Amino acid sequence: MLNNAMSVVILAAGKGTRMYSDLPKVLHTLAGKAMVQHVIDAANELGAAHVHLVYGHGGDLLKQALKDDNLNWVLQAEQLGTGHAMQQAAPFFADDEDILMLYGDVPLISVETLQRLRDAKPQGGIGLLTVKLDDPTGYGRITRENGKVTGIVEHKDATDEQRQIQEINTGILIANGADMKRWLAKLTNNNAQGEYYITDIIALAYQEGREIVAVHPQRLSEVEGVNNRLQLSRLERVYQSEQAEKLLLAGVMLRDPARFDLRGTLTHGRDVEIDTNVIIEGNVTLGHRVKIGSGCVIKNSVIGDDCEISPYTVVEDANLAAACTIGPFARLRPGAELLEGAHVGNFVEMKKARLGKGSKAGHLTYLGDAEIGDNVNIGAGTITCNYDGANKFKTIIGDDVFVGSDTQLVAPVTVGKGATIAAGTTVTRNVGENALAISRVPQTQKEGWRRPVKKK
């Protein structure tokens, strides 16, 4: 169906008192992303010409958090209802475009449902998203005559008979810009709350003989709003359950779907296995046959085919080629790169460092600002001393180097191919190819040494 041009209004002015937080409610995160960002992303995916964000409390925090989004900021200085919020945005509406109204605290609304609503909107009428609830207490009821929608009555203004209606208003609707402006201008606050309700435009449209078409969402969770942290946590679990289900159906083996969190986008190959309590953040790519152990956090990284990540390892902004093994308890920080078959063991940290093909750093090591060749052995307790308190310097280690345990490499320094660094050495000058570097203090031995004893 050919749709009119469309702009989106997102209401995000509420204080969120029941969150008990200094952060504006809509900035609280779901799956690692602000609730309002989920809604903005949906609007953009729908192809909105403009996104008008109506804000009030915490405006500076909102603008800082959403500075990269192309938004038209609309101030609602006083919170006098949803109709009042839309009135603030109305001057920006074009007469010949459709206006879709969304909410910053309803984060799981799907693009598919919104597109169906957009397609269903009758010419000159209103498309309305409604849902039926077993217990509709507190929600605005949809009134009908001969099956046709005639209006919405807020719970506090409803009669006992109207309160028996189970079909409720979700608050999400779409209408033509010129019509919307005309109806908004006619709103009054003659109700129990003394507020301007956007829902009153439904009755105004009906009085003009305009058609109102109701559409239902695919899932109830799509239209559930967040007023407190309990509701937010419940929606988080709904979202994560949906993501886990998609991954399982796509062939990813999640050992326990209830203990997996996806806070971004996961691209994966075949026969991927993910153990419990794993968190995926940002954009992550997993190759074929990747195995991730329990308790790992993977963020903005590419993991090649046949890699194995042992439990409680953190990988951030890193790249692993095929057949690498890391962990347990390893940390790859931004700029870490492992070439094919490399191994990083327990309590090893890498940052802005490359570990070559078949090279190994097995235990208790820090590799920062380093370039390490192929088939290198990094002994336990090795440290690249890359920082002098003001500037960072690079360590370069050639192919086939053996670095003994408890070695300090004071950068800038280069170790040539095939060199050997003796255990306990502090390397302060370049080491030539196939050379042995050793800087230990000569060992002394005192025979018959008696240990000190405590004085009584």
UniProtKB/Swiss-Prot annotation:
Catalytic activity entry: alpha-D-glucosamine 1-phosphate + acetyl-CoA = N-acetyl-alpha-D-glucosamine 1-phosphate + CoA + H(+); N-acetyl-alpha-D-glucosamine 1-phosphate + UTP + H(+) = UDP-N-acetyl-alpha-D-glucosamine + diphosphate
Entry's localization field: Cytoplasm
InterPro entries linked: Bifunctional_GlmU, GlmU-like, GlmU_C_LbH, Hexapep, Hexapep_transf_CS, MobA-like_NTP_Trfase, Nucleotide-diphossugar_trans, Trimer_LpxA-like_sf
Repeat as UniProt keyword: yes
Region feature N-acetyltransferase, mapped onto this chain: 251-456
Region (Pyrophosphorylase): 1-229
CDD domains in UniProt: GT2_GlmU_N_bac, LbH_GlmU_C
Residues bound to UDP-N-acetyl-alpha-D-glucosamine: 11-14, 25, 76, 81-82, 103-105, 140, 154, 169, 227, 333, 351, 366, 377
Protein family per UniProt: In the N-terminal section; belongs to the N-acetylglucosamine-1-phosphate uridyltransferase family.
Quaternary structure annotation from Swiss-Prot or TrEMBL: Homotrimer.
Protein's UniProt name: Bifunctional protein GlmU
